[in-house]
């Protein structure tokens, strides 16, 4: 089956065209700056790249551009739309409606629309991507794969907030969790690597990127995760605060005369390691600055790793033991300094970390960074959310 996988952002559209038999991306690319000046498409196939600048006023135009590239005489991969079997969409928030991927119909679109208030930056764009495909590739099934779905197995005592119960009943305010597609994918990959059934394993997965979250996975099911009602909770991130005392927000709003929008901006865009360091949200810049003696940059790195480590301890308690700790995503896969800070001094848990292996880890494959006698495995597992979306699409359509 050949699946077009789409990840629609508010001003970008990432795509991959995946053959599910070989699990290879035949081509991929991104349409960037949708609705903004300087829009372009970057398309890659077999290591070759083509960049085309043109006005892209909305997601419909973006989808048209993608289809043009897929059927391009030199850089394309198909002769006609008939060769696209299905389209798999990343949808950020599925609320309590969806605990699995789903074939899109009017009812599904209505539910995605109802979750817009939970993910105002992402869900409208995800929906635009779906509707653009219905218009431009009619008659082909669209499948929605939700970031929140994997975490719908969390027990109620884990996902509820200790607010008046009526608040949950009225507004569905609870922990939802995100990055579910990534957490699920790396858990499956880790089980394959360990040659053990996923349903026998206790795993802690650390998806560390510009947005970061940790997940406790017991026997293949998510039982807790660090993000919450929104992707703002949990770890300190690139520009997001992570969990803070809610009274701080009230105090600051009063002292600084801030409205809700300004506070939202502060928490989502000006906080995290950027806010602490005053340097950057990028860990490469932070490490460079820290090495040059910038104390705030060092503090930002230390705070980030300290929180990850706290979640590892917390989730080890929740799971009643751990078989493997997994690092994935941009920072998790590529930053040995962060990994080291997160897993040193965990000998009491049975984690025997190997510095040599960590700093010489091979990129692009599952790699073990623990000593042979370590009771707990520490693994780097490259994530592949697009492939997971293609797999879910295939699984649903072959049911």
From Swiss-Prot:
Signal peptide feature range: none
GO terms (BP aspect): acetate metabolic process; acetyl-CoA biosynthetic process
Alphabetically ordered keywords of this record: ATP-binding, Cytoplasm, Kinase, Magnesium, Metal-binding, Nucleotide-binding, Transferase
Name this polypeptide is given: Acetate kinase
Residues binding ATP: 14, 207-211, 282-284, 330-334
Positions contributing to Mg(2+) binding: 7, 385
Catalysed reactions listed for this entry: acetate + ATP = acetyl phosphate + ADP
Residues that hold substrate according to the record: 90
PANTHER family assigned: ACETATE KINASE (PTHR21060), ACETATE KINASE-RELATED (PTHR21060:SF15)
Cofactor(s) required for function per UniProt: Mg(2+); Mn(2+)
Top-rank EC class of the record's enzyme: transferase
Pfam families assigned to the protein according to its UniProt record, in alphabetical order: Acetate_kinase
EC number: 2.7.2.1
GO cellular component, one term: cytoplasm
Pathway info: Metabolic intermediate biosynthesis; acetyl-CoA biosynthesis; acetyl-CoA from acetate: step 1/2
Taxonomic source organism: Caldicellulosiruptor saccharolyticus (strain ATCC 43494 / DSM 8903 / Tp8T 6331)
Active site (UniProt): 147 (proton donor/acceptor)
One annotated GO molecular function: magnesium ion binding
PROSITE patterns registered for this protein in UniProt: ACETATE_KINASE_1, ACETATE_KINASE_2
Family statement drawn from the similarity comment of this UniProt entry: Belongs to the acetokinase family.
Protein encoded by which gene: ackA
Residue(s) at site: Transition state stabilizer: 179, 240
Cofactor note: Mg(2+). Can also accept Mn(2+).
């Amino acid at each position: 089956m050949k699946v077009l996988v789409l990840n629609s952002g508010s001003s970008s559209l990432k795509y991959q065209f995946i053959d599910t038999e070989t699990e290879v991306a035949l081509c991929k690319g991104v349409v960037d700056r949708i609705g903004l000046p300087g829009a372009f498409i970057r398309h890659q196939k077999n290591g070759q790249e083509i960049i085309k600048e043109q006005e892209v006023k909305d997601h419909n135009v973006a989808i048209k551009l993608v289809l043009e590239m897929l059927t391009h005489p030199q850089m394309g991969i198909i002769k006609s739309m008939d060769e696209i079997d299905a389209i798999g969409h990343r949808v950020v928030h599925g609320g309590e409606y969806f605990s699995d991927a789903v074939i899109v119909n009017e009812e599904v679109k209505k539910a995605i629309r109802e979750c817009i208030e939970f993910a105002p930056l992402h869900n409208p764009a995800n929906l635009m991507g779906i509707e653009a495909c219905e218009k431009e590739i009619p008659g082909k099934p669209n499948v929605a794969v939700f970031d929140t779905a994997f975490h719908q197995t969390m027990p109620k005592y884990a996902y509820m907030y200790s607010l008046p119960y009526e608040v949950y009943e009225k507004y569905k305010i609870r922990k939802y969790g995100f990055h579910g597609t990534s957490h699920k994918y790396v858990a499956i990959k880790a089980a394959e690597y360990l040659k053990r059934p996923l349903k026998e394993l206790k795993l802690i997965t650390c998806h560390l990127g510009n947005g970061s979250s940790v997940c406790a996975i017991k026997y293949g099911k998510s039982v807790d995760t660090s993000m919450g009602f929104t992707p703002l909770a949990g770890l300190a991130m690139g520009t997001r605060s992570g969990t803070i005392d809610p009274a701080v927000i009230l105090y600051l709003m009063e002292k600084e005369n801030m409205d809700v929008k300004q506070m939202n901006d502060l928490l989502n865009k000006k906080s995290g390691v950027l806010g602490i360091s005053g340097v950057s949200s990028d860990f490469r810049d932070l490490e460079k600055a820290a090495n040059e003696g910038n104390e705030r940059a060092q503090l930002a790195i230390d705070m980030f790793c300290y929180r990850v480590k706290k979640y590892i301890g917390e989730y080890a308690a929740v799971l009643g033991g751990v078989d493997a700790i997994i690092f994935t995503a941009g920072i998790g896969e590529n930053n040995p300094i962060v990994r080291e800070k997160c897993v040193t001094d965990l000998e009491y848990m049975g984690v025997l970390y190997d510095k040599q292996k960590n700093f010489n880890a091979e990129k692009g494959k599952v790699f073990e960074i623990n000593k042979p006698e370590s009771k707990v495995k520490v693994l780097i597992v490259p994530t592949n959310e697009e492939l997971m979306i293609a797999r879910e699409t295939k699984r649903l359509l072959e049911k």
